[in-house]
């Protein structure tokens, strides 16, 4: 991967200016959040039962909003690694209907999954919107994943 960037200048994760300037806006709405079917399952949910949001550049900040109504069955969980969103790891946050979460995190991927174990009618628990501010740092420079790191 290093060869790809050897002959040109680019900013990296430690470039302070990339975080001081205004971020490039990025929005995705009506993201269908699938039902996990995994509550109580010690093996966790399958990889197919999650929505993945990929960012083209490293984020400066990210906001996740649960667009569903504040009723039973509209909760979602969000995580910053594929393993984190699973039941067995429980390294996720929960948003009830109409709640949102914002943070200044450097990420290139976000994982969303339905949370309510009693939901049975259909495959979509709720919908979500994601708003992010992008830096000029290419996503490929934040290599790998947060999987395997404590708390993620």
Predicted feature locations:
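Noncatalytic modules at the cell exterior or secretory-pathway interfaces
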Residues: 62, 103-128
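A cross-kingdom feature marking solvent-exposed beta-strand/loop segments within repeated
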Residues: 40-50, 75-111
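C-terminal interaction-tip segments
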Residues: 1-41, 116-152
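Acidic glycine-/aspartate-rich tracts in secreted/extracellular proteins
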Residues: 67-74, 84, 115-119
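Beta-rich globular "head" domains
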Residues: 37-40, 47-77
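Short, well-ordered loop/turn elements at secondary-structure boundaries
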Residues: 5-6, 57-58, 106
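Residue-level recognition of well-ordered secondary-structure positions
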Residues: 4-5, 9, 63-65, 111
């Amino acid at each position: 991967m290093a060869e790809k960037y050897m002959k040109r200048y680019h900013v990296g994760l430690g470039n302070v200016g990339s975080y001081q300037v205004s971020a490039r806006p990025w929005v995705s709405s009506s993201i269908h959040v699938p039902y996990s079917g995994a509550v109580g399952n010690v093996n966790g949910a399958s990889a197919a039962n999650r929505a993945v949001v990929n960012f083209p550049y490293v984020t400066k900040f990210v906001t996740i909003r649960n667009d569903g109504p504040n009723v039973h069955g509209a909760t979602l969980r969000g995580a910053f690694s594929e393993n984190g969103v699973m039941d067995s790891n429980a390294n996720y946050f929960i948003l009830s209907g109409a709640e949102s979460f914002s943070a200044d995190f450097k990420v290139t991927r976000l994982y969303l999954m339905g949370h309510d174990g009693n939901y049975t009618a259909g495959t979509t628990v709720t919908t979500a919107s994601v708003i992010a501010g992008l830096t000029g740092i290419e996503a490929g420079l934040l290599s790998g994943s947060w999987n395997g790191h404590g708390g993620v």
